[in-house]
């Protein structure tokens, strides 16, 4: 079916416009049961993976996931997940995205993100391979992909950030990394590996994310280690 898939905790919903009036006349719940909590850590950003599954991120605990096309409930922990577009299957995926954004590179490596550091993790070991042997302990499923959290924004900090950073009570509670007006990632999100051809060739394969609190788009060049 042609349409769009929406993540709206506790549901994942399929919408379609079948008569061309630009209004959805089909609404079908594919899955339900996800945790509802802080918006930035809710289920988000479904992206088609290179294996034909749709991947989505979440920073909260999952829940007991049900759906009309599932054979039974699927227990989901605090982890990202992947699912079939027809709602026939859903399962955990390696890693847990800390905020909005899901990114794949050209060879299928998946990157996760947190508000305080870009490209926090690369995910070299897919969970669906590791689960085949229940008698073997699961190793660490993520690898740190960046070793910095400082920023160098071109624009001046928002006035409210300056005011907040001058409040000693706020600084004492949250610490310098969260209260300095500029200089640290505090809202990194919306990551993407550039894989198109509109930008110059030198941009291909580079990593981008934004930090709205600092009016900044960050670019990093990825180098494989090993």
How would you label these PLM feature ranges?
Residues 1-226:
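Beta-propeller domains with acidic blade repeats across secreted/periplasmic ectodomains
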